[in-house]
Amino acid sequence: MEPGLWLLFGLTVTSAAGFVPCSQSGDAGRRGVSQAPTAARSEGDCEETVAGPGEETVAGPGEGTVAPTALQGPSPGSPGQEQAAEGAPEHHRSRRCTCFTYKDKECVYYCHLDIIWINTPEQTVPYGLSNYRGSFRGKRSAGPLPGNLQLSHRPHLRCACVGRYDKACLHFCTQTLDVSSNSRTAEKTDKEEEGKVEVKDQQSKQALDLHHPKLMPGSGLALAPSTCPRCLFQEGAP
């Protein structure tokens, strides 16, 4: 009975630890008849062992073995990974168009809907910013471009739209720049008109100075002293 008690003690300890060793086929011959129920119970326990998420139970003839597969990792279609994928969707950076220069802040905020901020709002690095000009990039040559069109005759765009049929984006990349250029030309014309008016005023002042009595030769008239600035007197008068 002593070996049977030791066997029961070992089984209880190992079951408390979470692992039940399976009895070997050679042990059955060395054990007595009184140990047969215990061995049968241990074999039943091995067969009824529930495999965890990373283990597989393989039952052989007369014995049960546990093949651990924890090193292989969870399967791709496990429910845990599906829940993680549903809970944390991938972050997709949307981009409507590509600006030709990062100095155009309005274009940067319009095209790049997701902006990476660095240190301060003044220093921004838009996602996907590049100098891509599409088909409007010309070669370094003085000759005509394909299609007999010079680069200067092509419309100067401030950005390149991702979607070809995005009318709002195309309108922003073309019409907005035209409005700004028109405003600049209007400012230039206003400044030119102001300059012309100033030149005319200076010319009129010079003409008045030439007709002044002090500057006219042989008039014999001069301005009175500072005590009487409005008085005129004739030279040589008593």
Curated annotation (Swiss-Prot):
Cysteine pairings via disulfide bonds: 97-111, 99-107
Record organism: Homo sapiens
Name the record gives this protein: Endothelin-3
Biased composition, class Basic and acidic residues, residue ranges: 185-212
Family in the record: Belongs to the endothelin/sarafotoxin family.
PROSITE patterns the record matches: ENDOTHELIN
InterPro entries: Endothelin, Endothelin_toxin_CS, Endothln-like_toxin
Single Gene Ontology MF annotation: signaling receptor binding
Record-level GO BP terms: axon extension; axon guidance; blood circulation; cell population proliferation; cell surface receptor signaling pathway; cell-cell signaling; establishment of localization in cell; intracellular calcium ion homeostasis
PANTHER family, per database record: ENDOTHELIN (PTHR13874), ENDOTHELIN-3 (PTHR13874:SF11)
Function: Endothelins are endothelium-derived vasoconstrictor peptides.
Signal peptide: 1-16
Region (Disordered): 24-89, 183-219
Localization annotation: Secreted
Superkingdom in the source lineage: Eukaryota
Propeptide position ranges: 17-94, 118-238
Keywords, in A-Z order: Cleavage on pair of basic residues, Deafness, Disease variant, Disulfide bond, Hirschsprung disease, Secreted, Signal, Vasoactive, Vasoconstrictor, Waardenburg syndrome
